[in-house]
């Protein structure tokens, strides 16, 4: 921003900010005078020294309206400049904005521009950073003009010369000195900043650009082209920014009193020589203050020290030049000046940074003041401390309403003091402000009355740190309370993630009318009942409230007064109050409303004795006719509070039920009634938790008798596995996995037993069971450890990678009630402690992930209603849904807009038309209707809005279940929705105490649906074996790697379920079989992949040599010898190679089939032995993911996906459809070829030891992995395109969150982030555009560049065209057509043209960090990371920040362009005078949006 001389800062609003390198003229224009002395203040008078770093003459007075010498005091002398001391009489605040300057004795290079990577100066001059450094620090001379002497000596421009060489030339050609400096014959060589300045000044950028483009086109060397490209980027940046503008620009918005702009403010673009400074600015003294401490010492900003060093060295150098000191001394002083200026601008980048005297820490330079968490951007611009705020400890306020909070009187009086004072003065209670303050200090009783009036209807904001999502700040209506703690409503604790063990919260007072309005309309806690991340309610009763409701609605047979028939609910309540009816008694009530859920009447009729058969028959008839309702007294009490529209809720209410009910109430009757209902059930819950007297004792934890038997059985099984291992039929890996499986199963059985035991205890009224079953506290996992057995424990390791040995195979058999043995206790401490330490470490990681997500998505705002795209996502009903392995179909389409008609194939009708919104109800109906198998929905991923996204592609705003409004900051909401659970999940690990859960490997795969069996891509062999009973049987084994069994609906032919069949599986069904649910389809070996003989013959080993390619492992316990293939590379010479394989040969020795054997395989056959079809030749161990379901493994996975990192050992993926073949074997890799029918062939080299998934002759599709390992998202993008990679990322991230950790996040939030990762394209061929090859640019910028040349043509032959038309240049087609018409008229030769060539590009997948740094906004990127680099690049390119995102607007102090800060809303005016005003188009605003109401409030 520009402060003009003498006048106040301009008030004009600005809409963009341009970055450029400051020219010496602009530095001088901003300066008020030169700082000549290094002194700051006089040690005796403590007043600033004249011409020093704090000088009042330059920077303004230190006291308001008073000059330095005291001649002029008082405001009446405003603007006068004192004739004695030269200080202007003005306010002292100008010392925050007035700048000075230092004129340097020699030019000095700006460290940012030569130390940045790639060096900007180096790129322009084609010098390396090392060489530049030697020139700048006065080590070597650089030739600026070789002249005649240079030519004779063979010296070229830019050659570096040592001192001896330089002096040799100077002495040899003495007459050289007499020539003028600009004489081409003169030899000129210089060093230091001066040399660089001269060289940069002499550059011709246009010529450089042409030369470099030529190299790019013609050079054959990759290295030369890469270098040229690097240099061209910098040259082009300068060229683009340097477009000399006319000097007579009119003032923008009345910036200057004259009609013309004074010269220093005219931006002429960046000249390269500006990177070398002749004057340096001195920032205002109040921004580098000098503060007196007690004891007469001073605390000073480091910048003052750094400036002092510069001034001292500069003055010394000036003196030395004046006295004509010898060159050696001058050179040393110049170097020191260069170093001092370097330290001032960027001290942390230097190896020998300038340190302070006492504490020996590096001084904070100008760059350090901007960088990092403590820098200007993040500390002072993005987060500020605010007044009208306070903080205190929180306690529960059970009697508060949902929208209220209790505010301590002592806090309220401080926060609202100005308003109370005003009220006191207005009402005449106090005469003046001062007396009003006295009244307040005295705590006069009348003050409290006034305070009550003041806070009425004024909401306050409560915030609990860390504020992870928008529900971390909510508005409440304060009520005054005694004491010093803030009271908050128990139901909002979930949103704040607060508890009452000493948490603190901050209170903020919204001041302006608009702020109060927004707080009470948009932020009030009773309006924020729903989580934006999933659309599920967040204000859900917990703990005591749930327990109370559960207890209230539970039924018990044998209660007082059961089986009675009542006419109405009121009768029931009267009978209960008179103690004739027990709370849990089952009764019959006459009812004709809507019932939520019915009991099984048959079971209920059992409560009536058999001799009353008539009554029984009548009851049965009435219940079936739905005239009688069977319910309990407690449910009648509960239903008094349920809104009428919902009907009678007739079921036990647990936490899940409460959540569903609240969700239903919110959507059907609205927030107001929902808030009332919540307050009521809070009261009821607490009341009945108290009435029930529910607490637990040791006796409530019951240990099941069956535990001993189960453990005996498991011990037996594990011994059997050991015996098999000792015989050698199992590998070490299989033994381990099978034993872990056995104990895992037993632990689960014991857990189930103990759970059932608790359920039966006291007819289900065991308090421990009630707490567990209601969802109030505890989990089945904890009950298992209390009353069952602790089970298997994970062995803590740095990373959980699913390797064998991560679970200790000896389980803890005791439970916590019995107590652990010393050894068991010791084993379990490890896991428990690791959980606690993980928690603290991982929270930081989750916080950093959130920050990166915010930065990448902060500028995604809903900008338009409909982008008009026809594209969308295709969603199919997934099969794994039923088994819980995938997200439900309805969850994927809920709240979206259909891009095409959604059909019900069974009824052949449209369920949702194109453009229709899929609401909650429609989504649930579609989920229940199996006729709808797929849907096309609009998605953020395919939105074509130029800026931001459109509301149709986003769908509904999950927090209000209405279509999203224009102006909604969906990017920030997405970042919060993903980041918040990330932090939550990391905090959950320690509750399990490190016990292992999860993967029991299934050996049998069963049908989930009824239907007909179909095979897809399955090859089999038959193996004759003997079964357990000693009878012969035939097993059908699968020998294809990527086979599938599909279950098909026999009528419609639709595939209901697809099962992947592993290699070596044994099939139990054949094609066409009809199967029922739970029928076994196939069984497989979960812990290893088997290599199976497909033919009969003899085994022949190739390259399987003892000690080279395999080793013998002897088990120390059993003495059994295993043959394990090892990595042989280290055993052989460089030229040698091996490829271990098992061949099957016929009797005559002909090779029938070859099987490559991967590293770590166990051999199951011996050389030259006969084998039959189906025999196992070798087993390859498979790692099972077994570690518990905490997100410790999950968070790094999410980070890896968002950062689009290439996995450490990625799978090799086929790029084309075709058939697999194997090529030759090299030393460290073997060749895999994929060939298709068109003759196209791709070759891949696979590292030895990597497991190849494909067999010779297998058919593969593009994108299918050929080897094991994770697939790299970059490969998916390259082979299958952007849509596939977007879907892949969203699905993989969802897997971690929803399936592994059970956290619900809507797909849209992930899509918003993934969209941002694919916003850039890399230019391949620039064609005729201005773009450069390899440029990484925004997709929209690329499209615009192509659109700009779409109507243009290139002139090949200009014919008889006028002189202004040049060959090989671009012109508009219209212009050329017009000229050709004229040329034809005059019978002259025409202009020959060809169409302009468009640029080509490919999409790039960026990780969120690089995407945030590549954002179009300079300010946003600079405040994220790598501040100096971002600012350097922006300045060189003369970039403009259009202030479109949220972050940049916060930094420059404007309203954010989202929500009510949207431009369209800011200009809203309500004119009631003119009838025509109604016709003015204003954006549609929802009733709740306060923007339009602001003016009502103001009027």
Swiss-Prot record:
InterPro entries, from UniProt? DNA-dir_RpoC_beta_prime, DNA-dir_RpoC_beta_prime_bact, RNA_pol_asu, RNA_pol_N, RNA_pol_Rpb1_1, RNA_pol_Rpb1_3, RNA_pol_Rpb1_3_sf, RNA_pol_Rpb1_4
Q: Which GO terms describe its cellular component?
A: DNA-directed RNA polymerase complex
Provide the GO MF annotations for this entry: DNA binding; DNA-directed RNA polymerase activity; magnesium ion binding; zinc ion binding
The intrachain disulfides are none
The record lists Zn(2+) 2 as bound by 867, 943, 950, 953
Q: Name one Pfam family in it.
A: RNA_pol_Rpb1_2
Query: Where does the chain bind Mg(2+)?
Result: 499, 501, 503
According to its UniProt record, this protein's enzyme class is transferase
Q: Which UniProt keywords apply?
A: DNA-directed RNA polymerase, Magnesium, Metal-binding, Nucleotidyltransferase, Transcription, Transferase, Zinc
Reaction(s) catalysed by this chain's protein: RNA(n) + a ribonucleoside 5'-triphosphate = RNA(n+1) + diphosphate
Reading the lineage from the top rank, the first entry is: Bacteria
Q: Does the keyword Transferase apply?
A: yes
Which GO BP terms, alphabetically? Answer: DNA-templated transcription
| UniProt remark on cofactor binding | Binds 1 Mg(2+) ion per subunit. Binds 2 Zn(2+) ions per subunit.
What EC number(s) has UniProt assigned to this enzyme? 2.7.7.6
**Co-factor requirement:** Mg(2+); Zn(2+)
Entry-linked CDD domains: RNAP_beta'_C, RNAP_beta'_N
Q: Does the keyword Cell inner membrane apply?
A: no
Q: Which residues bind Zn(2+) 1?
A: 67, 69, 82, 85
UniProt family annotation: Belongs to the RNA polymerase beta' chain family.
On assembly, the entry states: The RNAP catalytic core consists of 2 alpha, 1 beta, 1 beta' and 1 omega subunit. When a sigma factor is associated with the core the holoenzyme is formed, which can initiate transcription.
Tell me the function of this protein. DNA-dependent RNA polymerase catalyzes the transcription of DNA into RNA using the four ribonucleoside triphosphates as substrates.
What is this protein called in UniProt? DNA-directed RNA polymerase subunit beta'
Its source organism is Prosthecochloris aestuarii (strain DSM 271 / SK 413)
From the UniProt record, report the name of the gene that encodes this protein: rpoC
């Amino acid at each position: 921003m520009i402060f003009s001389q003498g006048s106040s800062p301009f008030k004009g609003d600005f809409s963009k900010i341009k970055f450029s390198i400051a020219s010496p003229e602009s530095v001088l224009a901003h300066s008020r005078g030169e700082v000549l002395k290094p002194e700051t203040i006089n040690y005796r008078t403590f007043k600033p020294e004249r011409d020093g770093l704090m000088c009042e003459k330059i920077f303004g007075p230190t006291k308001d309206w008073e000059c330095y010498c005291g001649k002029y005091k008082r405001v009446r002398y405003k603007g006068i400049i004192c004739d004695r001391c030269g200080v202007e009489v003005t306010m002292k605040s100008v010392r925050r904005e007035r700048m000075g300057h230092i004129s340097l004795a020699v030019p000095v290079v700006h460290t940012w521009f030569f130390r940045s990577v790639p060096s900007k100066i180096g790129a322009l001059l084609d010098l390396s950073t090392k060489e530049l450094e030697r020139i700048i620090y006065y080590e070597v001379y650089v030739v600026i003009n070789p002249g005649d002497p240079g030519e004779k000596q063979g010296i070229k421009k830019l050659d570096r010369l040592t001192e001896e060489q330089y002096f040799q030339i100077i002495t040899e050609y003495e007459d050289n000195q007499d020539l003028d400096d600009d004489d081409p014959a003169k030899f000129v060589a210089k060093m230091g900043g001066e040399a660089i300045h001269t060289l940069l000044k002499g550059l011709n950028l246009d010529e450089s650009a042409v030369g470099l483009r030529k190299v790019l086109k013609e050079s054959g060397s990759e290295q030369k082209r890469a270098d040229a490209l690097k240099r061209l980027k910098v040259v082009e940046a300068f060229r683009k920014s340097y477009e000399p503008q006319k000097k007579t620009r009119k003032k923008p918005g009345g910036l200057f009193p004259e009609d013309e702009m004074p010269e220093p403010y005219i931006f002429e673009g960046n000249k390269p020589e500006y990177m070398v400074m002749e004057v340096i600015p001195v920032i205002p003294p109040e921004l580098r203050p000098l503060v007196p401490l007690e004891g007469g010492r001073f605390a000073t900003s480091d910048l003052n020290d750094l400036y002092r060093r510069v001034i001292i060295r500069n003055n010394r150098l000036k003196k030395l030049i004046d006295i004509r000191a010898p060159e050696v001394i001058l050179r040393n002083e110049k170097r020191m000046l260069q170093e001092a200026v370097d330290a001032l601008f960027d001290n942390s980048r230097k190896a020998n940074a300038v340190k302070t005297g006492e504490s020996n820490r590096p001084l904070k330079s100008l760059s350090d003041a901007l960088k990092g968490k403590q820098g200007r951007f993040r500390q002072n611009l993005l987060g500020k401390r605010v007044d009208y705020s306070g903080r205190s400890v929180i306690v529960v306020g059970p009697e508060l309403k949902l929208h209220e909070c209790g505010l301590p009187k002592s806090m309220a009086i401080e926060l609202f003091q100005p308003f109370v004072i005003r009220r006191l003065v207005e009402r005449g209670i106090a005469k003046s402000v001062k007396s009003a303050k006295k009244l307040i200090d005295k705590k006069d009783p009348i003050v409290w009355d006034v305070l009550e009036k003041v806070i009425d209807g004024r909401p306050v904001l409560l915030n609990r740190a860390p504020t992870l999502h928008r529900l971390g700040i909510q508005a409440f209506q304060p009520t005054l309370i005694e004491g010093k703690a803030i009271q908050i409503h128990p139901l909002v604790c979930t949103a704040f993630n607060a508890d009452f063990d000493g948490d603190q919260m901050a209170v903020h007072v919204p001041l302006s009318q608009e702020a109060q309005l927004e707080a009470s309309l948009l932020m009030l806690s009773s309006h924020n009942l729903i989580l934006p991340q999933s659309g599920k309610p967040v204000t859900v009763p917990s703990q005591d409230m749930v327990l109370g409701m559960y207890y209230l609605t539970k039924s018990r047979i044998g209660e007082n007064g059961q089986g009675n028939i009542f006419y109405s609910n009121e009768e029931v309540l009267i009978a209960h109050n008179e103690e004739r009816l027990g709370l849990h008694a089952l009764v019959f009530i006459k009812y004709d409303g809507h019932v939520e859920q019915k009991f099984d009447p048959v079971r209920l009729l059992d409560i009536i004795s058999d001799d009353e058969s008539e009554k029984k028959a009548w009851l049965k008839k009435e219940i079936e006719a739905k005239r009688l309702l069977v319910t309990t007294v407690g449910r009648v009490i509960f239903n008094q509070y349920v809104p009428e529209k919902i009907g009678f809720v007739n079921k036990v209410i647990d936490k899940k039920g409460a959540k569903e009910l609240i969700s239903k109430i919110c959507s059907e009757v609205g927030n107001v009634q929902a808030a009332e209902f919540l307050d009521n059930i809070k009261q009821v819950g607490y009341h009945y938790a108290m009435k029930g007297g529910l607490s637990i004792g040791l006796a409530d934890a019951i240990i099941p008798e069956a535990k001993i038997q189960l453990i005996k059985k498991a011990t037996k099984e594990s011994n059997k596995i050991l015996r098999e291992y000792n015989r050698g039929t199992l590998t070490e890996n299989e033994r381990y996995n099978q034993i872990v499986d056995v104990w895992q199963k037993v632990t689960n059985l014991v857990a189930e037993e103990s759970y059932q035991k608790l359920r039966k205890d006291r007819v289900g009224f065991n308090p421990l069971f009630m707490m567990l079953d209601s969802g109030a506290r505890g989990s089945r996992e904890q009950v298992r450890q209390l009353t069952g057995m602790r089970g298997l424990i994970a062995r803590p390791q740095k990373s959980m990678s699913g390797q064998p040995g991560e679970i200790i195979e000896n389980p803890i058999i005791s439970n916590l009630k019995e107590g652990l043995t010393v050894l068991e206790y010791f084993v379990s401490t490890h896991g428990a402690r690791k959980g606690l330490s993980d928690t603290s470490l991982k929270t930081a990681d989750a916080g950093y992930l959130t920050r990166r997500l915010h930065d990448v998505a902060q500028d995604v705002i809903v900008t338009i209603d409909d982008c008009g795209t026809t594209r969308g996502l295709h969603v199919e009903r997934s099969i794994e849904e039923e088994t819980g392995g995938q997200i439900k179909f309805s969850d994927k389409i809920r709240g979206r807009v259909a891009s095409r008609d959604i059909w019900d194939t069974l009824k052949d009708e449209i369920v949702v038309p194109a453009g229709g919104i899929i609401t909650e109800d429609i989504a649930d109906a579609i989920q229940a209707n199996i006729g709808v198998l797929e849907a096309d929905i609009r998605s953020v991923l395919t939105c074509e809005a130029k800026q931001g996204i459109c509301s149709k592609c986003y769908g509904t705003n999950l927090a209000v279940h209405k279509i999203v409004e224009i102006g909604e900051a969906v990017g920030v909401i997405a970042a919060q929705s993903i980041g918040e659970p990330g932090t939550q999940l990391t905090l959950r690990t320690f509750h399990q105490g490190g016990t292992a859960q999860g993967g029991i490997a299934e050996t049998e795969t069963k049908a989930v649906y009824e239907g007909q069996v179909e095979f897809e891509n399955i090859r089999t062999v038959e193996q004759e074996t003997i079964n357990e009973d000693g009878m012969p049987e035939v097993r059908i084994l699968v020998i294809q790697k990527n086979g599938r069994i599909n279950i098909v609906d026999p009528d419609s032919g639709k595939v209901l379920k697809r099962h992947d069949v592993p290699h070596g599986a044994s099939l139990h069904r054949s094609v066409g079989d009809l199967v029922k649910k739970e029928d076994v389809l196939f069984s497989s070996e979960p812990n290893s992949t088997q290599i199976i003989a497909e033919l009969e013959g003899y085994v022949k080993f190739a390259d399987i040599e003892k000690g080279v390619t395999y080793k013998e492992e002897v088990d120390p316990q059993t003495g059994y010898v295993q043959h394990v293939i090892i990595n042989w590379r280290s055993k052989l010479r460089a030229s040698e190679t091996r490829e271990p394989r098992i061949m099957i040969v016929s009797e005559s020795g002909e090779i029938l089939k070859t099987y490559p054997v991967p590293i770590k395989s166990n051999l199951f056959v011996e050389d030259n032995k006969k084998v039959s079809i189906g025999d196992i030749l070798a087993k390859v161990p498979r790692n099972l993911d077994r570690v518990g379901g905490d997100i410790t493994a999950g968070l790094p996975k999410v980070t890896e996906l968002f950062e689009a990192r290439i996995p450490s050992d990625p799978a090799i993926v086929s790029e084309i459809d075709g058939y697999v073949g194997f090529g030759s074997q090299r030393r460290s890799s073997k060749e895999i070829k994929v060939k298709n029918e068109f003759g196209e062939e791709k070759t891949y080299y696979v590292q030895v030891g990597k497991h190849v998934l494909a067999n010779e002759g297998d058919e593969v599709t593009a994108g299918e992995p050929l080897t094991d390992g994770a697939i790299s998202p970059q490969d998916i993008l390259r082979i299958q395109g952007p849509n596939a990679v977007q879907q892949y990322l969203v699905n993989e991230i969802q897997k971690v969150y929803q399936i592994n950790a059970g956290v619900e996040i809507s797909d849209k939030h992930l899509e918003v982030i993934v969209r941002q990762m694919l916003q850039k394209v890399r230019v391949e061929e620039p064609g005729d555009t201005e773009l450069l090859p390899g440029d990484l640019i925004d997709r929209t910028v690329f499209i615009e560049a192509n659109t700009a040349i779409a109507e243009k043509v290139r002139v090949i032959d200009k014919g008889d065209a006028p002189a202004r038309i040049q060959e090989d240049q671009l012109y508009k087609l219209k212009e050329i057509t017009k000229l050709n018409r004229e040329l034809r008229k005059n019978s002259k030769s025409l202009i020959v043209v060809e169409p302009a060539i468009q640029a080509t590009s490919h999409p790039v997948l960026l990780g969120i960090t690089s995407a945030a740094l590549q954002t179009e906004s300079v300010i946003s990127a600079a405040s994220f990371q790598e501040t100096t680099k971002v600012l350097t690049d922006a300045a060189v390119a003369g970039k403009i920040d259009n202030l479109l995102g949220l972050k940049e607007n916060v930094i420059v102090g404007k309203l954010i362009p989202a929500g009510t800060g949207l431009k369209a809303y800011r200009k809203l005016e309500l004119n009631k005078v003119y009838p025509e005003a109604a016709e003015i188009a204003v954006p549609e605003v929802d009733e709740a949006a306060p923007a339009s109401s602001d003016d009502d409030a103001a009027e």
